[in-house]
């Protein structure tokens, strides 16, 4: 029986490239001239520090733009609370890796509510979908890809015929 896995993974090489491009753009932007601002990447976390809250939001939008250019979905990005220490504003940005159990249950429920002729089962941090026909699998892929309520980007791999 044909099957595939639904996963949610981020390519951290592309994230590092986007952070490097953002740091390069930070050096050349006029609104960041004579400003202490930095963006660094370390172990799946991007740390952003600036002198003001406005500059922090600008730097996050620069990062989002560079992530989009590198084809990393911005939905996988989670911005943590902004912290002010002295005259510096700091923010950590984390990336969702894997499918959490609540989200996996929503994916399975969405597929079952659509009344497609497929079976979906949770296997750790991924969801396996099996069906008798490849067309049913493609319908399930389109359903998951177009569902905005899940709030997470998904990739499909491990296709079997």
Swiss-Prot record:
GO CC, any one term: cytosol
Keyword Cell membrane among UniProt keywords: no
SUPFAM superfamilies, per the entry: YajQ-like
UniProtKB keywords: Nucleotide-binding
GO molecular function: nucleotide binding
InterPro entries for this protein: DUF520, UPF0234-like_C, UPF0234_N, YajQ-like_sf
Family statement drawn from the similarity comment of this UniProt entry: Belongs to the YajQ family.
Function: Nucleotide-binding protein.
Name recorded for this polypeptide: Nucleotide-binding protein PBPRA2024
Naturally occurring in which organism (per UniProt): Photobacterium profundum (strain SS9)
